[in-house]
Amino acid sequence: MRWLIPLLTLTLSLAACVDSADTPPVESPEAAQQQAVQQEQPQPEQVAQTAQQQEQPAAVQNRLEASQAEQPQARQLAEETPDTPFDPDAVEMAQLIFWGPLDGFFGRYLPIPPAGQALLDQLLAADSPAIDKYIIDLSAFPNPYWEQALDYLKRRYGEALRTVYDSPEIFNFHPEDRATPAYLRFKQALFGSQFEDMAEMMDPDAAIVIDAREIQWGGVRVDGIPPLEFPTQVFPDEAAEWINDTDIVVGVEIDGDARAYPIRIIAWHEMVNDTIGGVPVSLAYCTLCGSPILFDGRVGSEVYRFGTSGLLYRSNKLMYDRNTRTLWNQFSGKPAWGPLVDRDIRLKVLPVVVTTWGDWYEHHPDTTVLSIDTGFVRDYGPGVAYNDYFNSPLTWFNVPVKDDRLAQKDNVYAVRVGEALTAYPIEVLAERALIQDQVGLLPIVVIATANGSGGRAYESSNVLFESADPVAGTLIDANGNTWTIREDSLLGPDGQELPRVGGHNAYWFAITNQTDNGRLWEG
């Protein structure tokens, strides 16, 4: 199935080019200016002309001139010290980059200059643990060296590889290797050769708290998977002609404002910037790790709105904020690379539920639903977006941490209390209807949805629950009292309320690869 990655990349890239010019409204002119501009790609017959005649941006041209001046020095160093092992971290490997954004995707077919080929030959012949991170990038990102890098992997591992992700061994980095400043400069230059706005978010001098060696290109430009900005909501009768009772939706209610976001729509966009119940929120949906997470965008006096960077970390999307263009980890809600890393910021995770439209509508008759008229040209039919991926046990990108207690893509319901996180297997939750547990120091009760596709979590205080009826939306406690399941709380006798706790669905591999202290509930 890995052959689908290049096909998906092409499909998403082409789709990004045919979006309507009438984009959804944004919150401010500043946010609008920061949205990525959809650029036309050059035709094949223009490649030679592009390489020789078109003017490069000043930053790229200056880098190329500096590279040309440094390359003879690198070759001389290798010739004068032939017995010294080649260390790519001691040489500016950014010298390999001789093409620029104006060359487009066809830049990968440009002829390689002798100096670049000589440096690549040294890299591929080196016996150093430092080379792997460079080879991964050269074989995963479109560039003129891609075929040689992949051929190297085939020789090294003796496999009929189609992509670098068919060779997971190379991602087992040597314990002594690290993402050096020279490597960060190389990585920024490589990604900047195609996407300058993406490279701006990969500042080698900025603080970073994730391993840059594991940051990979997701196959699209910045906002190439276009976020929805304050999209239109419609009433159920308006959506009746296209929505089905069995459609899976992400249900949200804040201060009485109930909304449904069909997965079949948001899978094409992966980010929804909205305001619900007066709260500025971002629904960040990582399709690759199965996690629709609703973040409160307020941090102190700031309000953050987000876009899609086009980058991945351990098969999880890296989003970016429109204020500072810092890269954020979508799963943790924390800054990962950029100006905000040192601010000790963590976005608040708000509760969502993954259920069917029929179940959501039955219990929320006043709900609205995301309009299918998004302003973008997409096939929003049921089971279209990512259908093959959702129905496959395989991941498309590297995930280094394997935990065989569950399959990599088993669905879990993740409950968050501060820094603590516990994952509840959704199949088990559906069978039991309810689970009482403690996350961190907080006693909670987790309740399955009516169709068994998700869950809700609430503080349980000192109440012991004996049974739950997700279809009826009720629980029975040990004293025989009936409690009503609501989105903001459980409502019990004498008006007693137990508040909701933040939680969301995810694949198991997201828990093991994106958290340091994620716990699996095992009964």
PLM features per residue range, with description:
Residues 79-95, 108, 113-126, 136-137, ...:
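Structural detector for internal amphipathic alpha-helices that build alpha-solenoid repeat scaffolds
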Residues 23-35:
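N-terminal propeptides/low-complexity segments immediately following signal peptides
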Residues 14-16:
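C-terminal motif of bacterial Sec signal peptides marking the signal peptidase cleavage site
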Residues 62, 75-78, 100-107, 132-523:
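Mid-to-C-terminal functional-domain signal that highlights helix-capping/loop sites
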Residues 1-4:
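Positively charged n-region of N-terminal signal peptides that target proteins for export
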Residues 18-20:
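Bacterial signal peptide processing site
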Residues 32-99, 107, 124, 198-212:
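N-terminal low-complexity, Pro/Thr/Ser-rich intrinsically disordered segments
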